[in-house]
UniProtKB/Swiss-Prot annotation:
UniProt name for this protein: Intestinal-type alkaline phosphatase
Function text: Alkaline phosphatase that can hydrolyze various phosphate compounds.
Organism: Mus musculus
Residue numbers covered by the propeptide annotation in the UniProt entry: 529-559
Keyword hit for Glycosyltransferase: no
Length: 559
Protein backbone atom coordinates (compact mmCIF):
# COMPACT_ATOMS: atom_id res chain seq x y z
CA UNK A 1 0.00 0.00 0.00
CA UNK A 2 1.29 3.46 -0.93
CA UNK A 3 2.54 5.88 1.74
CA UNK A 4 -0.13 8.60 1.26
CA UNK A 5 -2.92 6.04 1.52
CA UNK A 6 -1.46 4.74 4.79
CA UNK A 7 -1.54 8.33 6.01
CA UNK A 8 -5.16 8.51 4.98
CA UNK A 9 -6.10 5.46 7.00
CA UNK A 10 -4.08 6.32 10.08
CA UNK A 11 -4.13 10.09 10.15
CA UNK A 12 -7.45 11.42 8.91
CA UNK A 13 -9.77 9.31 10.99
CA UNK A 14 -9.28 11.11 14.29
CA UNK A 15 -7.39 14.31 13.63
CA UNK A 16 -9.62 15.70 10.91
CA UNK A 17 -12.81 14.74 12.70
CA UNK A 18 -11.82 17.13 15.48
CA UNK A 19 -10.26 19.66 13.12
CA UNK A 20 -10.03 23.38 13.62
CA UNK A 21 -10.76 26.07 11.09
CA UNK A 22 -8.70 29.22 10.50
CA UNK A 23 -9.90 32.03 12.74
CA UNK A 24 -9.83 34.49 9.83
CA UNK A 25 -12.74 32.67 8.21
CA UNK A 26 -15.01 34.11 10.90
CA UNK A 27 -14.28 37.58 9.54
CA UNK A 28 -16.35 38.70 6.52
CA UNK A 29 -13.25 40.47 5.22
CA UNK A 30 -11.64 37.09 4.54
CA UNK A 31 -14.41 36.01 2.19
CA UNK A 32 -14.76 39.43 0.59
CA UNK A 33 -11.04 39.46 -0.17
CA UNK A 34 -11.10 35.99 -1.72
CA UNK A 35 -14.09 36.87 -3.89
CA UNK A 36 -12.50 40.16 -4.96
CA UNK A 37 -9.33 38.34 -6.00
CA UNK A 38 -11.31 35.81 -8.01
CA UNK A 39 -13.35 38.60 -9.60
CA UNK A 40 -10.21 40.52 -10.53
CA UNK A 41 -8.70 37.42 -12.14
CA UNK A 42 -11.91 36.82 -14.09
CA UNK A 43 -11.91 40.40 -15.41
CA UNK A 44 -8.34 39.99 -16.62
CA UNK A 45 -9.03 36.66 -18.31
CA UNK A 46 -8.40 36.84 -22.04
CA UNK A 47 -9.08 34.01 -24.51
CA UNK A 48 -6.06 32.62 -26.32
CA UNK A 49 -7.16 33.13 -29.91
CA UNK A 50 -4.44 31.17 -31.69
CA UNK A 51 -4.61 27.57 -32.83
CA UNK A 52 -3.43 24.74 -30.60
CA UNK A 53 -0.23 22.92 -31.49
CA UNK A 54 -0.96 20.20 -28.93
CA UNK A 55 -4.27 18.67 -27.85
CA UNK A 56 -4.77 16.72 -24.62
CA UNK A 57 -8.00 15.24 -23.32
CA UNK A 58 -8.14 13.82 -19.79
CA UNK A 59 -11.07 11.48 -19.27
CA UNK A 60 -12.10 10.60 -15.74
CA UNK A 61 -14.22 7.51 -16.34
CA UNK A 62 -17.33 7.83 -14.18
CA UNK A 63 -16.10 11.09 -12.66
CA UNK A 64 -19.39 12.87 -12.11
CA UNK A 65 -19.59 16.18 -10.27
CA UNK A 66 -20.15 14.51 -6.85
CA UNK A 67 -16.98 12.49 -7.46
CA UNK A 68 -15.05 15.66 -8.34
CA UNK A 69 -16.18 17.31 -5.11
CA UNK A 70 -15.37 14.29 -2.96
CA UNK A 71 -11.96 14.00 -4.64
CA UNK A 72 -11.26 17.64 -3.85
CA UNK A 73 -11.97 16.99 -0.18
CA UNK A 74 -9.84 13.85 -0.10
CA UNK A 75 -6.88 15.38 -1.92
CA UNK A 76 -6.99 18.48 0.26
CA UNK A 77 -6.99 16.38 3.41
CA UNK A 78 -4.09 14.27 2.15
CA UNK A 79 -2.19 17.55 1.76
CA UNK A 80 -2.93 18.51 5.36
CA UNK A 81 -5.85 20.87 4.74
CA UNK A 82 -9.47 20.68 5.85
CA UNK A 83 -10.41 19.57 2.35
CA UNK A 84 -13.16 21.37 0.44
CA UNK A 85 -11.34 24.70 0.16
CA UNK A 86 -8.27 23.24 -1.54
CA UNK A 87 -8.48 23.33 -5.36
CA UNK A 88 -7.79 20.37 -7.60
CA UNK A 89 -5.52 20.85 -10.59
CA UNK A 90 -8.58 20.73 -12.83
CA UNK A 91 -10.29 23.39 -10.69
CA UNK A 92 -7.63 25.87 -11.80
CA UNK A 93 -8.65 25.63 -15.45
CA UNK A 94 -10.28 28.95 -16.39
CA UNK A 95 -13.15 27.69 -18.54
CA UNK A 96 -15.81 25.10 -17.86
CA UNK A 97 -19.14 23.80 -19.10
CA UNK A 98 -21.60 20.98 -18.58
CA UNK A 99 -21.89 18.02 -20.94
CA UNK A 100 -25.11 16.10 -21.66
CA UNK A 101 -24.06 12.46 -21.69
CA UNK A 102 -27.08 10.56 -23.05
CA UNK A 103 -26.53 8.34 -26.08
CA UNK A 104 -28.83 8.06 -29.09
CA UNK A 105 -30.72 5.10 -27.62
CA UNK A 106 -30.09 5.36 -23.85
CA UNK A 107 -30.90 8.08 -21.34
CA UNK A 108 -28.12 6.73 -19.11
CA UNK A 109 -25.13 5.83 -21.30
CA UNK A 110 -22.16 3.50 -21.24
CA UNK A 111 -18.50 4.29 -21.88
CA UNK A 112 -18.61 3.09 -25.50
CA UNK A 113 -21.28 5.42 -26.82
CA UNK A 114 -19.90 8.34 -24.83
CA UNK A 115 -16.36 7.75 -26.13
CA UNK A 116 -17.68 8.01 -29.67
CA UNK A 117 -19.27 11.34 -28.77
CA UNK A 118 -16.38 13.17 -27.10
CA UNK A 119 -13.64 11.59 -29.26
CA UNK A 120 -15.31 11.40 -32.69
CA UNK A 121 -17.88 14.19 -32.47
CA UNK A 122 -20.94 12.03 -33.17
CA UNK A 123 -23.42 10.48 -30.74
CA UNK A 124 -24.18 6.81 -31.23
CA UNK A 125 -25.82 3.75 -29.68
CA UNK A 126 -25.12 1.90 -26.45
CA UNK A 127 -22.12 -0.48 -26.53
CA UNK A 128 -20.93 0.57 -30.00
CA UNK A 129 -17.73 2.54 -30.67
CA UNK A 130 -16.53 4.61 -33.61
CA UNK A 131 -19.75 4.13 -35.55
CA UNK A 132 -22.79 6.25 -36.25
CA UNK A 133 -26.16 5.44 -34.72
CA UNK A 134 -27.07 3.63 -37.95
CA UNK A 135 -24.98 0.70 -36.66
CA UNK A 136 -26.58 -1.87 -34.39
CA UNK A 137 -25.07 -3.52 -31.34
CA UNK A 138 -23.59 -6.95 -32.03
CA UNK A 139 -24.60 -6.90 -35.71
CA UNK A 140 -21.32 -7.07 -37.60
CA UNK A 141 -22.81 -6.28 -41.00
CA UNK A 142 -23.94 -2.84 -39.79
CA UNK A 143 -20.32 -1.78 -39.23
CA UNK A 144 -19.30 -1.13 -42.80
CA UNK A 145 -20.17 2.29 -44.16
CA UNK A 146 -21.10 3.63 -40.73
CA UNK A 147 -17.56 4.38 -39.47
CA UNK A 148 -16.82 7.74 -37.86
CA UNK A 149 -13.27 8.91 -37.19
CA UNK A 150 -11.73 10.33 -34.06
CA UNK A 151 -10.00 13.67 -33.64
CA UNK A 152 -6.88 11.65 -32.85
CA UNK A 153 -7.10 9.98 -36.25
CA UNK A 154 -7.41 13.40 -37.89
CA UNK A 155 -4.45 14.70 -35.86
CA UNK A 156 -2.32 11.82 -37.13
CA UNK A 157 -3.35 12.61 -40.71
CA UNK A 158 -2.21 16.18 -40.11
CA UNK A 159 1.27 15.00 -39.13
CA UNK A 160 1.02 15.13 -35.36
CA UNK A 161 2.17 12.38 -33.03
CA UNK A 162 -0.62 10.68 -31.10
CA UNK A 163 -0.91 8.71 -27.90
CA UNK A 164 -3.26 6.76 -25.65
CA UNK A 165 -2.74 6.37 -21.90
CA UNK A 166 -5.14 4.50 -19.61
CA UNK A 167 -5.34 2.60 -16.35
CA UNK A 168 -7.70 0.10 -17.99
CA UNK A 169 -6.80 -2.29 -20.79
CA UNK A 170 -5.95 -0.29 -23.92
CA UNK A 171 -8.70 -2.20 -25.73
CA UNK A 172 -11.37 -0.95 -23.30
CA UNK A 173 -14.29 1.22 -24.38
CA UNK A 174 -12.89 4.66 -23.59
CA UNK A 175 -9.36 4.39 -25.03
CA UNK A 176 -10.50 2.37 -28.03
CA UNK A 177 -12.75 5.25 -29.02
CA UNK A 178 -9.63 6.91 -30.39
CA UNK A 179 -9.01 4.21 -33.00
CA UNK A 180 -11.69 1.50 -33.28
CA UNK A 181 -14.90 0.85 -35.21
CA UNK A 182 -16.89 -1.94 -33.56
CA UNK A 183 -20.49 -2.93 -32.93
CA UNK A 184 -19.51 -4.65 -29.69
CA UNK A 185 -17.28 -3.03 -27.07
CA UNK A 186 -16.47 -6.46 -25.59
CA UNK A 187 -14.70 -7.81 -28.68
CA UNK A 188 -11.30 -7.21 -27.06
CA UNK A 189 -9.58 -10.08 -28.89
CA UNK A 190 -10.58 -12.56 -31.57
CA UNK A 191 -11.41 -15.14 -28.88
CA UNK A 192 -14.17 -12.81 -27.68
CA UNK A 193 -15.91 -12.70 -31.06
CA UNK A 194 -18.51 -15.05 -32.56
CA UNK A 195 -17.40 -17.00 -35.61
CA UNK A 196 -20.11 -15.32 -37.69
CA UNK A 197 -18.65 -11.86 -37.04
CA UNK A 198 -15.18 -13.02 -38.04
CA UNK A 199 -16.57 -14.53 -41.25
CA UNK A 200 -18.34 -11.28 -42.07
CA UNK A 201 -15.05 -9.38 -41.82
CA UNK A 202 -15.28 -7.69 -38.45
CA UNK A 203 -12.02 -7.32 -36.53
CA UNK A 204 -11.35 -7.51 -32.83
CA UNK A 205 -10.33 -4.36 -30.98
CA UNK A 206 -6.73 -5.43 -30.35
CA UNK A 207 -6.18 -6.01 -34.06
CA UNK A 208 -7.62 -2.60 -34.87
CA UNK A 209 -5.28 -1.04 -32.28
CA UNK A 210 -2.27 -1.81 -34.46
CA UNK A 211 -3.89 -1.64 -37.90
CA UNK A 212 -6.33 1.27 -38.03
CA UNK A 213 -3.72 3.97 -37.43
CA UNK A 214 -0.11 4.42 -36.36
CA UNK A 215 -0.29 5.33 -32.67
CA UNK A 216 3.03 6.60 -31.30
CA UNK A 217 2.43 5.94 -27.61
CA UNK A 218 0.21 3.18 -26.19
CA UNK A 219 0.33 2.78 -22.40
CA UNK A 220 -2.02 0.80 -20.17
CA UNK A 221 -3.10 -2.79 -19.61
CA UNK A 222 -4.31 -5.50 -21.97
CA UNK A 223 -1.33 -7.77 -22.67
CA UNK A 224 -3.32 -10.99 -22.98
CA UNK A 225 -5.27 -9.85 -26.05
CA UNK A 226 -2.05 -9.19 -27.99
CA UNK A 227 -0.40 -12.63 -27.84
CA UNK A 228 -1.22 -16.15 -29.13
CA UNK A 229 -3.28 -18.39 -26.87
CA UNK A 230 -1.19 -20.04 -24.20
CA UNK A 231 1.69 -17.54 -24.35
CA UNK A 232 2.98 -17.17 -20.75
CA UNK A 233 2.67 -13.71 -19.28
CA UNK A 234 6.08 -12.15 -18.45
CA UNK A 235 4.92 -11.02 -15.01
CA UNK A 236 2.77 -14.03 -14.10
CA UNK A 237 4.39 -16.89 -16.07
CA UNK A 238 2.82 -19.63 -13.95
CA UNK A 239 -0.74 -18.30 -14.02
CA UNK A 240 -2.75 -20.02 -16.74
CA UNK A 241 -5.50 -17.40 -16.44
CA UNK A 242 -3.13 -14.65 -17.58
CA UNK A 243 -1.74 -16.25 -20.74
CA UNK A 244 -2.34 -14.93 -24.24
CA UNK A 245 -5.80 -15.43 -25.70
CA UNK A 246 -5.45 -15.00 -29.45
CA UNK A 247 -6.84 -17.87 -31.50
CA UNK A 248 -5.36 -16.62 -34.78
CA UNK A 249 -1.82 -17.19 -33.50
CA UNK A 250 -0.76 -13.60 -34.15
CA UNK A 251 1.71 -11.71 -31.98
CA UNK A 252 0.32 -8.21 -32.33
CA UNK A 253 3.09 -6.61 -30.28
CA UNK A 254 5.75 -7.99 -32.60
CA UNK A 255 3.75 -6.93 -35.64
CA UNK A 256 3.50 -3.41 -34.24
CA UNK A 257 7.24 -3.25 -33.50
CA UNK A 258 8.14 -4.40 -37.00
CA UNK A 259 6.05 -1.61 -38.55
CA UNK A 260 7.86 1.31 -36.94
CA UNK A 261 11.44 2.47 -36.81
CA UNK A 262 12.37 3.69 -33.33
CA UNK A 263 9.72 1.53 -31.65
CA UNK A 264 10.00 -0.13 -28.24
CA UNK A 265 7.80 -2.41 -26.12
CA UNK A 266 7.92 -2.45 -22.29
CA UNK A 267 5.89 -4.19 -19.59
CA UNK A 268 7.13 -2.71 -16.30
CA UNK A 269 7.93 0.66 -14.77
CA UNK A 270 11.71 0.33 -14.89
CA UNK A 271 11.64 -0.35 -18.61
CA UNK A 272 9.20 2.52 -19.16
CA UNK A 273 11.39 5.08 -17.42
CA UNK A 274 14.45 3.85 -19.28
CA UNK A 275 12.88 4.03 -22.74
CA UNK A 276 11.28 7.41 -22.05
CA UNK A 277 14.76 8.87 -21.63
CA UNK A 278 15.97 7.52 -24.98
CA UNK A 279 15.60 10.30 -27.60
CA UNK A 280 15.61 7.76 -30.43
CA UNK A 281 12.29 6.30 -29.26
CA UNK A 282 9.38 7.69 -31.29
CA UNK A 283 7.00 4.75 -30.85
CA UNK A 284 6.43 3.25 -27.41
CA UNK A 285 4.01 0.54 -26.33
CA UNK A 286 3.77 -0.33 -22.65
CA UNK A 287 1.34 -2.99 -21.45
CA UNK A 288 1.65 -3.37 -17.70
CA UNK A 289 -0.99 -5.98 -16.85
CA UNK A 290 -2.73 -8.84 -18.67
CA UNK A 291 -6.05 -6.96 -18.39
CA UNK A 292 -6.60 -3.72 -16.42
CA UNK A 293 -3.91 -2.12 -14.28
CA UNK A 294 -4.06 -2.41 -10.51
CA UNK A 295 -5.82 0.15 -8.35
CA UNK A 296 -3.28 2.74 -7.32
CA UNK A 297 -3.31 1.76 -3.64
CA UNK A 298 -2.52 -1.83 -4.68
CA UNK A 299 0.17 -0.89 -7.18
CA UNK A 300 3.77 -2.04 -6.76
CA UNK A 301 5.64 1.27 -7.20
CA UNK A 302 8.77 -0.54 -8.40
CA UNK A 303 6.98 -2.66 -11.00
CA UNK A 304 3.84 -0.77 -11.97
CA UNK A 305 3.87 2.80 -13.30
CA UNK A 306 1.31 5.24 -11.97
CA UNK A 307 -1.00 7.21 -14.24
CA UNK A 308 1.22 10.20 -13.53
CA UNK A 309 4.28 8.22 -14.70
CA UNK A 310 2.57 7.14 -17.90
CA UNK A 311 1.28 10.64 -18.63
CA UNK A 312 4.71 12.20 -18.16
CA UNK A 313 6.30 9.59 -20.41
CA UNK A 314 3.70 10.13 -23.12
CA UNK A 315 4.08 13.90 -23.11
CA UNK A 316 7.87 13.65 -23.31
CA UNK A 317 7.88 11.16 -26.18
CA UNK A 318 5.13 12.87 -28.16
CA UNK A 319 6.76 16.30 -27.72
CA UNK A 320 9.62 15.17 -29.94
CA UNK A 321 7.42 15.93 -32.96
CA UNK A 322 7.76 19.62 -33.94
CA UNK A 323 4.27 19.50 -35.45
CA UNK A 324 2.72 18.78 -32.06
CA UNK A 325 0.66 15.96 -30.66
CA UNK A 326 -2.73 14.64 -29.58
CA UNK A 327 -2.94 12.71 -26.30
CA UNK A 328 -5.80 10.84 -24.64
CA UNK A 329 -5.35 10.09 -20.92
CA UNK A 330 -7.91 8.08 -18.97
CA UNK A 331 -8.31 7.56 -15.26
CA UNK A 332 -10.29 4.43 -15.98
CA UNK A 333 -10.35 2.75 -12.59
CA UNK A 334 -12.43 5.50 -11.00
CA UNK A 335 -15.33 3.87 -12.77
CA UNK A 336 -14.46 0.38 -11.58
CA UNK A 337 -14.22 1.51 -7.97
CA UNK A 338 -17.73 2.92 -8.18
CA UNK A 339 -19.13 -0.20 -9.86
CA UNK A 340 -17.79 -2.24 -6.95
CA UNK A 341 -19.42 0.13 -4.47
CA UNK A 342 -15.98 0.86 -3.02
CA UNK A 343 -15.80 4.63 -2.88
CA UNK A 344 -12.34 4.47 -1.32
CA UNK A 345 -10.93 2.89 -4.48
CA UNK A 346 -12.80 5.26 -6.78
CA UNK A 347 -11.70 8.42 -4.99
CA UNK A 348 -8.06 7.44 -4.50
CA UNK A 349 -7.96 6.72 -8.24
CA UNK A 350 -9.42 10.17 -8.88
CA UNK A 351 -6.70 11.76 -6.75
CA UNK A 352 -4.06 10.09 -8.92
CA UNK A 353 -5.95 11.25 -12.02
CA UNK A 354 -5.71 14.85 -10.80
CA UNK A 355 -1.99 14.43 -10.11
CA UNK A 356 -1.56 13.35 -13.73
CA UNK A 357 -3.40 16.47 -14.87
CA UNK A 358 -1.14 18.58 -12.69
CA UNK A 359 1.99 16.97 -14.12
CA UNK A 360 0.87 17.43 -17.72
CA UNK A 361 0.14 21.09 -16.99
CA UNK A 362 3.69 21.49 -15.71
CA UNK A 363 5.17 19.87 -18.81
CA UNK A 364 3.15 21.87 -21.34
CA UNK A 365 2.30 25.51 -21.96
CA UNK A 366 -1.24 26.78 -22.17
CA UNK A 367 -0.03 29.13 -24.92
CA UNK A 368 0.12 26.23 -27.39
CA UNK A 369 -1.64 23.29 -25.69
CA UNK A 370 -5.40 22.92 -25.37
CA UNK A 371 -6.12 20.66 -22.40
CA UNK A 372 -9.63 19.43 -21.69
CA UNK A 373 -10.69 17.46 -18.63
CA UNK A 374 -14.08 15.75 -18.56
CA UNK A 375 -15.97 12.58 -17.71
CA UNK A 376 -17.90 10.20 -19.91
CA UNK A 377 -20.72 9.76 -17.40
CA UNK A 378 -21.48 9.90 -13.70
CA UNK A 379 -22.46 7.26 -11.12
CA UNK A 380 -25.27 6.91 -8.58
CA UNK A 381 -22.79 8.12 -5.95
CA UNK A 382 -23.58 10.80 -3.38
CA UNK A 383 -22.38 12.10 -0.05
CA UNK A 384 -24.27 14.02 2.61
CA UNK A 385 -25.36 13.77 6.22
CA UNK A 386 -24.29 17.24 7.40
CA UNK A 387 -20.76 16.09 8.20
CA UNK A 388 -18.48 18.56 9.94
CA UNK A 389 -15.94 20.31 7.78
CA UNK A 390 -12.64 18.51 7.99
CA UNK A 391 -14.08 15.08 8.72
CA UNK A 392 -12.94 12.22 6.53
CA UNK A 393 -14.92 11.90 3.32
CA UNK A 394 -15.11 8.18 4.13
CA UNK A 395 -16.51 8.75 7.61
CA UNK A 396 -19.92 8.69 9.28
CA UNK A 397 -22.67 11.26 9.45
CA UNK A 398 -22.72 13.06 12.84
CA UNK A 399 -26.22 11.84 13.77
CA UNK A 400 -27.77 8.40 13.56
CA UNK A 401 -30.53 7.34 11.18
CA UNK A 402 -34.11 6.60 12.30
CA UNK A 403 -33.15 3.00 13.08
CA UNK A 404 -30.73 4.30 15.70
CA UNK A 405 -27.66 3.22 13.77
CA UNK A 406 -24.92 5.33 12.20
CA UNK A 407 -24.60 5.68 8.45
CA UNK A 408 -21.78 6.71 6.17
CA UNK A 409 -21.72 10.09 4.48
CA UNK A 410 -21.10 8.36 1.14
CA UNK A 411 -23.94 6.19 -0.18
CA UNK A 412 -24.95 4.66 -3.52
CA UNK A 413 -28.38 4.63 -5.13
CA UNK A 414 -27.83 1.02 -6.13
CA UNK A 415 -25.02 -1.49 -5.97
CA UNK A 416 -23.57 -4.60 -4.33
CA UNK A 417 -23.66 -2.88 -0.94
CA UNK A 418 -27.41 -3.41 -0.57
CA UNK A 419 -28.01 -4.80 2.92
CA UNK A 420 -31.09 -6.91 2.15
CA UNK A 421 -34.28 -7.27 4.14
CA UNK A 422 -32.58 -7.61 7.52
CA UNK A 423 -31.30 -4.90 9.80
CA UNK A 424 -28.64 -2.50 8.63
CA UNK A 425 -25.13 -3.26 9.90
CA UNK A 426 -23.89 -1.14 12.77
CA UNK A 427 -21.04 0.31 10.72
CA UNK A 428 -18.09 1.91 12.51
CA UNK A 429 -15.75 4.65 11.36
CA UNK A 430 -12.93 2.11 11.20
CA UNK A 431 -14.93 -0.11 8.85
CA UNK A 432 -16.11 2.74 6.63
CA UNK A 433 -12.54 3.98 6.16
CA UNK A 434 -11.34 0.62 4.86
CA UNK A 435 -10.22 0.40 1.25
CA UNK A 436 -12.47 -2.60 0.52
CA UNK A 437 -15.57 -1.39 2.37
CA UNK A 438 -18.69 -1.46 0.20
CA UNK A 439 -21.01 1.45 0.84
CA UNK A 440 -24.63 0.74 1.60
CA UNK A 441 -26.92 0.97 -1.43
CA UNK A 442 -30.67 1.44 -1.75
CA UNK A 443 -31.24 -1.16 -4.50
CA UNK A 444 -29.48 -4.53 -4.97
CA UNK A 445 -27.56 -4.92 -8.23
CA UNK A 446 -24.41 -6.91 -8.93
CA UNK A 447 -22.58 -3.88 -10.30
CA UNK A 448 -23.48 -0.32 -9.32
CA UNK A 449 -24.76 1.61 -12.32
CA UNK A 450 -23.88 4.78 -14.13
CA UNK A 451 -25.71 8.02 -13.41
CA UNK A 452 -27.42 10.05 -16.10
CA UNK A 453 -26.77 13.62 -14.97
CA UNK A 454 -24.57 16.12 -16.79
CA UNK A 455 -20.83 16.04 -16.19
CA UNK A 456 -18.30 18.87 -16.09
CA UNK A 457 -15.85 19.95 -18.79
CA UNK A 458 -12.75 21.92 -17.74
CA UNK A 459 -10.52 23.63 -20.32
CA UNK A 460 -7.33 25.66 -20.61
CA UNK A 461 -5.24 26.81 -23.56
CA UNK A 462 -5.95 28.01 -27.10
CA UNK A 463 -9.68 28.17 -27.87
CA UNK A 464 -10.56 26.95 -24.37
CA UNK A 465 -13.12 29.76 -24.18
CA UNK A 466 -15.29 27.73 -26.56
CA UNK A 467 -16.02 25.47 -23.59
CA UNK A 468 -19.04 27.23 -22.10
CA UNK A 469 -22.65 26.71 -21.13
CA UNK A 470 -24.44 23.38 -21.42
CA UNK A 471 -23.43 21.36 -24.46
CA UNK A 472 -24.02 18.01 -26.08
CA UNK A 473 -21.12 15.68 -25.30
CA UNK A 474 -20.04 15.42 -28.93
CA UNK A 475 -19.31 19.17 -28.87
CA UNK A 476 -16.02 18.40 -27.09
CA UNK A 477 -14.52 16.70 -30.14
CA UNK A 478 -15.49 19.64 -32.32
CA UNK A 479 -13.82 22.12 -29.97
CA UNK A 480 -10.61 20.11 -30.12
CA UNK A 481 -10.70 19.67 -33.90
CA UNK A 482 -11.42 23.36 -34.40
CA UNK A 483 -8.65 24.44 -32.04
CA UNK A 484 -6.16 22.20 -33.84
CA UNK A 485 -7.38 23.21 -37.31
CA UNK A 486 -8.11 19.58 -38.05
CA UNK A 487 -10.81 18.13 -40.32
CA UNK A 488 -13.43 19.45 -40.89
CA UNK A 489 -11.98 22.75 -39.61
CA UNK A 490 -8.75 22.88 -41.64
CA UNK A 491 -9.68 26.39 -42.79
CA UNK A 492 -9.95 27.56 -39.20
CA UNK A 493 -8.44 30.98 -39.85
CA UNK A 494 -6.44 30.83 -36.61
CA UNK A 495 -2.86 32.03 -36.34
CA UNK A 496 -0.34 29.51 -35.02
CA UNK A 497 0.66 29.83 -31.37
CA UNK A 498 3.35 32.38 -30.59
CA UNK A 499 6.92 31.19 -30.17
CA UNK A 500 7.27 29.86 -26.63
CA UNK A 501 10.49 31.79 -26.00
CA UNK A 502 8.54 35.03 -26.45
CA UNK A 503 5.71 34.08 -24.13
CA UNK A 504 7.25 32.37 -21.14
CA UNK A 505 6.50 35.29 -18.86
CA UNK A 506 2.80 35.24 -19.74
CA UNK A 507 2.29 31.51 -20.03
CA UNK A 508 -0.12 31.17 -17.14
CA UNK A 509 -1.63 34.64 -16.94
CA UNK A 510 -4.93 33.51 -18.38
CA UNK A 511 -5.53 30.86 -15.75
CA UNK A 512 -7.81 31.80 -12.90
CA UNK A 513 -5.91 30.82 -9.79
CA UNK A 514 -7.59 29.95 -6.55
CA UNK A 515 -5.77 30.96 -3.41
CA UNK A 516 -5.29 28.05 -1.03
CA UNK A 517 -6.04 28.98 2.53
CA UNK A 518 -3.06 28.43 4.79
CA UNK A 519 -4.01 27.46 8.29
CA UNK A 520 -2.21 29.70 10.77
CA UNK A 521 -1.32 28.91 14.32
CA UNK A 522 -4.21 31.08 15.48
CA UNK A 523 -7.22 28.85 14.92
CA UNK A 524 -10.75 28.43 16.10
CA UNK A 525 -12.40 25.04 16.57
CA UNK A 526 -15.18 24.02 14.21
CA UNK A 527 -18.37 25.98 14.81
CA UNK A 528 -20.24 24.75 17.91
CA UNK A 529 -17.11 23.30 19.52
CA UNK A 530 -16.37 24.09 23.15
CA UNK A 531 -13.65 26.66 22.53
CA UNK A 532 -15.75 28.69 20.10
CA UNK A 533 -18.70 29.17 22.46
CA UNK A 534 -19.30 30.89 25.76
CA UNK A 535 -19.67 29.10 29.13
CA UNK A 536 -23.43 28.65 28.78
CA UNK A 537 -23.14 26.64 25.58
CA UNK A 538 -19.92 24.79 26.31
CA UNK A 539 -21.66 21.63 27.66
CA UNK A 540 -23.55 21.25 24.37
CA UNK A 541 -20.35 21.58 22.40
CA UNK A 542 -18.61 19.04 24.61
CA UNK A 543 -21.49 16.64 24.08
CA UNK A 544 -21.13 17.01 20.31
CA UNK A 545 -17.42 16.32 20.52
CA UNK A 546 -18.05 13.32 22.73
CA UNK A 547 -20.54 12.00 20.20
CA UNK A 548 -17.99 12.37 17.43
CA UNK A 549 -15.42 10.49 19.50
CA UNK A 550 -17.91 7.68 20.07
CA UNK A 551 -18.51 7.43 16.34
CA UNK A 552 -14.78 7.30 15.69
CA UNK A 553 -14.35 4.54 18.24
CA UNK A 554 -17.16 2.51 16.73
CA UNK A 555 -19.91 3.19 19.30
CA UNK A 556 -23.29 4.48 18.04
CA UNK A 557 -23.95 8.10 18.92
CA UNK A 558 -27.26 9.22 20.34
CA UNK A 559 -29.47 10.82 17.72
Amino acid sequence: MQGPWVLLLLGLRLQLSLSVIPVEEENPAFWNKKAAEALDAAKKLQPIQTSAKNLIIFLGDGMGVPTVTATRILKGQLEGHLGPETPLAMDRFPYMALSKTYSVDRQVPDSASTATAYLCGVKTNYKTIGLSAAARFDQCNTTFGNEVFSVMYRAKKAGKSVGVVTTTRVQHASPSGTYVHTVNRNWYGDADMPASALREGCKDIATQLISNMDINVILGGGRKYMFPAGTPDPEYPNDANETGTRLDGRNLVQEWLSKHQGSQYVWNREQLIQKAQDPSVTYLMGLFEPVDTKFDIQRDPLMDPSLKDMTETAVKVLSRNPKGFYLFVEGGRIDRGHHLGTAYLALTEAVMFDLAIERASQLTSERDTLTIVTADHSHVFSFGGYTLRGTSIFGLAPLNALDGKPYTSILYGNGPGYVGTGERPNVTAAESSGSSYRRQAAVPVKSETHGGEDVAIFARGPQAHLVHGVQEQNYIAHVMASAGCLEPYTDCGLAPPADESQTTTTTRQTTITTTTTTTTTTTTPVHNSARSLGPATAPLALALLAGMLMLLLGAPAES
